[in-house]
A protein has these predicted regions:
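Conserved nucleotide-sugar donor-interacting segment of glycosyltransferase catalytic cores
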Residues: 83-121
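Membrane-proximal helix-turn-helix segments that form the acceptor-binding/catalytic region
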Residues: 65-69, 91-99, 127-166
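Conserved donor-binding/catalytic core segment of Leloir-type glycosyltransferases
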Residues: 184-197
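Short catalytic/ligand-binding loop motif for oxyanion handling, primarily in non-cytosolic enzymes
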Residues: 12-15, 36-40, 82-85, 111-116, ...
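N-terminal subdomain of nucleotide-sugar transferases
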Residues: 1-38, 42-43, 98-102, 164, ...
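Glycine-rich, highly charged phosphate/nucleotide-binding loops
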Residues: 46-67
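Acceptor-binding helix/loop patch of EC 2.4 sugar-transfer enzymes
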Residues: 41-42, 105-151, 192-194
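Short N-terminal targeting/anchoring amphipathic segment
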Residues: 2-6, 66-89, 102-106
Length: 197
């Protein structure tokens, strides 16, 4: 089976690729190496935020996209799967969906639902957004709120999670459905996060 893993979070995709290769699958990891962590990858999509870095990233991405066709499975690490602002992701996602058989959406790292549930409802005693009953208002917590709430990243996350052609594996379904169930019970959400399943 041909498998493409896009994005990285704590070396999850590279480790998964090693295991899948041992089972005889053809696996390609395309990522930026999880930013400063520099994890291994087959296709380097690191993005340095300088003029030269932007040009280099755009060139490497445009050269890589035609090679990202014909896979049996493409797994995205999360809705923002490249080191890039959310807006271009929708076009890259549409391209990947058009030229590959199956898309699987991971729920690794931050996303809109994680931020919303943990910030507003605090189902866990400790999270990125609360310590016990005390809501974190420090710069680190607020940065994630600013990225994921009321933004293009939120809209991208909702679009991918609701796309009928995107599969969400069982572990990630649990993450998305748990968030949906908590939001629904609280009255913060009136319709399911996922329409595909």
């Amino acid at each position: 089976m041909r498998i493409l893993l896009i994005g990285e979070y704590s070396n999850v995709h590279w480790t998964l690729a090693q295991g899948l290769r041992m089972l005889g699958h053809e696996v390609t990891v395309a990522s930026g190496g999880d930013s400063w962590k520099g994890y291994p990858r087959d296709v380097d999509l690191a993005h340095v935020l300088t003029l030269k870095g932007h040009v280099s990233f755009a060139w490497r991405l445009l050269r890589a996209l035609p090679k990202m066709r014909g896979y049996d499975i493409v797994q995205l690490i999360n809705p923002v799967f490249l080191e890039l602002s959310p807006w271009p992701h929708r076009f890259i996602f549409d391209y990947l969906r058009r030229y590959n058989k199956n898309i699987v959406l991971g729920a690794f790292g931050m996303d809109h639902y994680w931020v919303k549930v943990n910030r507003e409802l605090r189902p866990m005693r400790y999270s990125d957004f609360n310590i016990g009953d005390v809501v974190r208002t420090d710069k680190v917590a607020q940065t994630d709120v600013d990225i994921w709430i009321g933004t293009e990243a939120e809209r991208l996350c909702e679009r991918l999670a609701k796309d009928k052609e995107v599969q969400i594996d069982d572990l990630n379904k649990l993450a998305y459905y748990t968030g949906w169930t908590i939001l629904r019970k609280s009255g913060s959400l009136t319709k399911p996060l996922l329409s595909n399943g």
